[in-house]
Amino acid sequence: MLAVADVVCWAVILAMIGFVLAPTMGDRNTLGSHDWDQMESHRYLVDKTILAYHQFPFWNPYACGGHPNWGGFESGTTVVSPWLPFYLAMTLPHALRVEVWGMALLSAVGAWLLASRFTKSPAVRALVVVAFAVNGRWALQITSGHTWHLAYAWTPWVLYFYDRAVGADASLGPPRRRHVVLAGACLALMVYMGGIYPLPQTVFVVALYGVFLSMTTRSLRPIVVGAACGLLSLGLSAPKLFPILEVLRKHPRLVDSTETIDFSGFVDVLTSREQDMSSGHGGVSQWGWHEWGMYVGWPVVVALVLGVVAGRGTRESALKWAGLVCLSLGFGAFDPHAPWPLLHDLPVFQSQHVPSRWMYPALLLLLAVTASAAERLLRRAAWARGALELLLVAAVSYVAYDVGQIAHQPTRHMFTAKMPAVAESTGPFHVEPHLPRELVYEAEWAPSSLTAEMANVGTIDCGTFPAFHNYFRDQQGHVPGLGAHGVGDKDYRGEAFIPEGVGTATVTRWSPNEVAVEVHGAQPGEHVVLNQNYDPGWSARGHEVDDWLDTVRADLHEPDATVVFRYRPPTFLPGVLVFVVTLGGIGWAYRRARRARAAA
């Protein structure tokens, strides 16, 4: 019977996901709106740099006057991803749909596996999936273009492998070292795939769960295992993480976060059936409803309350308290000494806002506790369990229908922008102050970048790099670190020039990471400047370059020369070295364990 129930429940789950995302498959050649241009630009840049220029996507020359691409947390996120082959082989609109659908399915499988650690019931596992994987919040966030939210798909996987690695419940089998590696690998994927909020929140959740589990088990093993997962994730993600940290060191992202929500607003978040992008509700302080809504419906809310009250056990108590802490963070800055303002003072969390995002992982934890409470009830039912399972399958089918109906509301607007009719080019490159009129499409609150990348044109305006974002510029359009200039600007002197005024500089070969400049008639001791924002990763002829008014400058030692500027993040190779050492350590530990088993 359980096998049949498994099939039925997965049919319900897949039908729900299909219904929620069905609007994306109407016109399959459209793009998203709101924040989607930024995310589409990041993905298109990876494709163009690899396919057209045969380079690794280290630098983005097209936006803000140039900025690190691989060192951005939200950029370069398809390079180490299961979706890279699809982006390289498909059109951008088609690949976007593969990623969104794929991450929804990945989240569903992860939530199912996590629930399996707490219940044998297919229906209860399915309840965890349908209430978490593609609920109202997921739909609102993805529709708005917050593709970093997709990385939450790895959160249940991390918790699943971590729980197996700790092995606090002996009835579920002995702990395995490989699960420590797998948990670390999932955390590393969150780094590579742009989990700007999911990653620190998942690390925090694992830390909370580990501390509380150490208290309930009276053992340090959960803390040690959590630390091992963290160290492995650091090593496995080092090629991406180190450049990110280098960028954050130079351009710290510090934001205020004074958002609050009252109890009536919280009830609306979970139960109001008006959950579209333009919905308006009271009880919340700021931002659009896409930053608050998380519809799961009254049946799930009631089940969660009962589950939290009835949930008990070594792991369940630890998960419950971890979930309640995350939930309290979601209420924001309702008091100066509330959990969120205190956490927001700490490194990493200083760069985050919109604390309602904590409610999503809180929901997952409390759903797992509820699943355990339901399992205990089903065990007591003895011979009546089969009948109860049938009732639960019917109930979870209704929940899937209910949540799916509401999550369907925003996804109707997910991909509505027509693909720009812009010819893709690798022709001569130049920088404009603003996006040329002929490239403007579906203007949103931030400047568009996709069409500039397609036409091989750079812009000073941008929304792809937080440090240079138009939103943070002064009235003159300036922000620290922005040194490049666009055509028509009084300070624009070409894409390469000699500031001293003697001699000429001409770009003869151009690609995102490498620019060759031919210099004639210069005097020794002069300099050649590349019209891109300065970053320590730039070099010229194998030597470091200078920061000249926030642009890239190299020394000249002869009157005629070809100067090749190249960009690579300074911490990339050290990160690769750490990655290789980490892989070697994992391989060594695996071989040692095999030998030990063979000798036993």
Write out the residue ranges for each language-model feature:
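Membrane-interface coil-to-helix junctions
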Residues: 14-108, 130-153, 261-287, 332-340, ...
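Membrane-interface helix-loop junctions at the exits of transmembrane helices
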Residues: 18-26, 85-90, 94, 123-145, ...
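Periplasmic/ER-lumenal interhelical loops and adjacent helix-loop junctions
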Residues: 37-58, 230, 235-309, 425-441, ...
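Signature aromatic-anchored transmembrane alpha helix within multi-pass, membrane-resident enzymes
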Residues: 227-234, 368, 374-404
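Active-site-proximal, structured, solvent-exposed surfaces of multi-pass membrane proteins
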Residues: 328, 491-600
